[in-house]
């Protein structure tokens, strides 16, 4: 796991600091730093993937179903991290997510797509959650 992160950080200006920041966001990765990535749980692998992306210091982070198939406690950890990243600023996040509550808490703007067409859009936040749930019939 540590080597996996180091591979991304090597040769990047500020790579070491970016790795430390990513590990601060996902402390469980410090605990499993000696394990091979293939031996991690699904949630740990997802956290590792997000950490690797953050080390590159992107302007836009693309997250496609980051909580799919992950146990609820790890879903909460990922949600808290994404919310912290969006609040901190300086990083755009494009999130595709089936957990409506998480998506709405993270969103500044939302779009509901059905069959490739936008069927609903608006400002994010928990106030819009019912609108989205109705549009999705959830």
Go through the PLM ranges and name each one.
Residues 97-98:
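H-loop/switch region of ABC-family ATPase nucleotide-binding domains
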